[in-house]
């Protein structure tokens, strides 16, 4: 039986041809293994693009909320989610604003947050993401080797509420586990 990564191959090829930045096969396989192991119930994705990574994130039955600033890509993602049987709430808007608003309303809500949008915005959402993720929940961020992620990488590696490892795969990812909900 084909796994989800194999089924995503045509979308991966099309994305590369059209210049749509996606996770790709190698990091996709890593993420799929994490999703299978962690089985997150509630997932937040910042940066939907055409839905490639969202399909992986939602493939184990978790409830996916995903935020995309480009309305055309958001519509495309909705179609791709439907095609792959992924239940997702697609929010068209700015991820930084969405997270800020949500963090003012709820805390300890998501089991997993996946960040893969404007690199300079990673640091802007970090504190709100920490509020939103449950204790022992995870924040995964893509592209840690990018210059725009430097401040974020430094922050997650030294944050007192997180245990973080940098995954040396392609252009690196970070895997941060929330270890405390206490005010420090």
Where are these regions (language model features)?
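Hydrophobic packing residues within well-ordered alpha-helices of enzyme cores
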Residues: 57, 77, 81, 99-102, ...
